[in-house]
Amino acid sequence: MKLLCWEKSIHGS
């Protein structure tokens, strides 16, 4: 699931 990839990016802001 690529969701975890970009999700960490937005949440890591």
Swiss-Prot record:
Keyword field contains Membrane: no
Phenotype on disruption: Reduced nodule number after inoculation with Sinorhizobium meliloti SM2011; remaining nodules are abnormally spherical and contain a few small rod-shaped bacteroids, their development is impaired. Bacteroids development is arrested at stage II-III and they undergo premature senescence in cells of the fixation zone leading to the formation of vacuole-like structures as a result of symbiosomes fusion. Reduced mycorrhizal colonization by arbuscular mycorrhizal fungi (e.g. Glomus mosseae and G.intraradices).
Cystine pairings recorded for this chain: none
Keyword Ion transport among record annotations: no
Function: Modulates the action of auxin, and may function as plant growth regulator that alters phytohormone responses. During symbiosis with rhizobacteria such as Sinorhizobium meliloti SM2011, in response to Nod factors and under nitrogen limitation, involved in nodule initiation by inducing dedifferentiation and division of root cortical cells (primordium formation), and essential for bacteroid development during nodulation; this processus is repressed by ethylene.
Note: Enod40 mRNA triggers RBP1 translocation to cytoplasmic granules from the nucleus during nodule development.
Name the record gives this protein: Early nodulin-40-1
Origin species: Medicago truncatula
